[in-house]
């Protein structure tokens, strides 16, 4: 909603919580909320990260339980794997500016086009833990993997439209916050079918927790000066608050294979089913406008809204040099982000499926003690922000297409007969990731 003003202003706005990386929209009443979620579908382990995520055709340690369960059958001894990760998020969102038209030049309505800002958040967590046990042609593994650990906070200040004829429009300013935790627990198994072919299957329990809120504020006073001034977010000027919440789980499947084409060349693939969870939402009244209920009273509540997370297909090929020192690996992932708007039956916004390309290399100094490995990698993360498919200026202002990102990674590993330690870094515009992992076999 928006109201126009001839010079003395009255306001209205639209409730919307902004776009980043990976987004889940929830339609509520005549308004719309978009919750920023930044999920990582990268494989666990610092070794995989050093390869730029090109690991599905290798999958030769306990992290294969997630990356490609077929790889577990390559293990010679039981293994315990543990990983800690640190994430430095920089989540972009539209802060204000012009949804359409030229600025009036009054107060904060002075920007041609849109203003953007970022929500910065740092997190550290035990991101992966697994235990793998091989026996003859069969291997089993249990694991825990963190998909997401993210908090977001943002404020809008003065998103305007109109002004070409008689009227200026200022949408409601908003304070937005969300917290997301998404963890997977899995049991994976692998079986050696023949000398050259392995298959794997995983059963995954996905546990999702989300808390998000957006509060709309009118300008501080009903004056022209205040209409074009920064918002102080006064409690007495709140219009509505909308909350979204998830506390749900789902069971999914993972299947994979490894095919040794020759002694030096191998081909692998994996399919990972996306989870479906239920979202609840409610809208409550603020203090400014009489909406028929007291401030804090519920205007709308709904539960059980299904959201499907993407299915993922991955195929890769890896080559090892005759002396075993150099390994080069390539992987293609298809991430079906369009499952999200399709599950919500949205017709005014969409997300494109993404074709990720991963490339990495490892060189091992075989004569060193302990054995030292260095790794370099890169991968393409295509744009997968929710974008508007309608001509409404406000929706288009907040649901803008994003940019493709190139990630660059590097890693270092030390290995003895029983113990392996790996360190890796992955750098991109929206998130930098650091990983430290260890594997012990016994």
Where are these regions (language model features)?
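Short hydrophobic "helix-edge" motifs at membrane interfaces and signal-peptide entry regions
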Residues: 16, 57-59, 185
